[in-house]
From Swiss-Prot:
Lineage: Bacteria, Bacillati, Cyanobacteriota, Cyanophyceae, Synechococcales
Enzyme class: transferase
Keywords tagged on the record: ATP-binding, Kinase, Nucleotide biosynthesis, Nucleotide-binding, Transferase
The name this protein goes by in its record: Thymidylate kinase
Domain of life: Bacteria
Binding site for ATP: G10, I11, D12, G13, C14, G15, K16, T17
GO biological process, one term: dUDP biosynthetic process
Entry keyword annotation includes Zinc-finger: no
Family that this chain belongs to: Belongs to the thymidylate kinase family.
EC number: 2.7.4.9
Record's GO cellular component terms: cytosol
A molecular-function term among this protein's GO annotations: dTMP kinase activity
Amino acid sequence: MRGKFIVIEGIDGCGKTTQIDEISKWIPTSGLLRGKQKLVKTREPGGSLLGKKIRNLILDNHKDNKPSSLAELLLYSADRAEHISKTISPALENQDWVLSDRFCDSTLAYQGYGRNINLEIIKNIESIVCQGESPDLTIFLEISAEESVLRREKFIPDRMESEGIKFLEKVNEGFKLIAKEKNWTTISALQDINTITNEIKETLLKKFSRVNND
């Protein structure tokens, strides 16, 4: 038996990090874990030691030396390959649960729909990179590009967050298409934090309580 792999997706400013922090505190006391199972909280990019260095390369503003779209794609892919090998797969094989802030579909949304890189190229790369790993559940926190910009206007943006609203709109439309195609659980991120947290808890209990009791 392997552990469960849960991913939370969405555009910048949707509240993923806040919700992952809340849910990661709740899961160990929820009754979902069995025996010696633990929860591993992680993120992309930067979910491994090497990944943290790659994250800095990807998200640094670089001023006049920004990476090309293809280089950016391959950096994200390198981060994910290491993340899976060093963090995700070992945890799942140990029967632990993994809760990740982003996974492979963020690349499809940002580099595919956002950067206009051929989707089939990305899917082919991801088929190698993901090493057979796929989430048991993906939750999409949905907000508009306009709301994302409003929420982040007080913060210093990283390179991806500096791309502007037109880029973000394309990414968001990509996420919506992927969510529909893959039957994700979509939750409105316009609600207050506690309401969103409770909806995520209900989703997890509904999906995994029965599995654990079988």
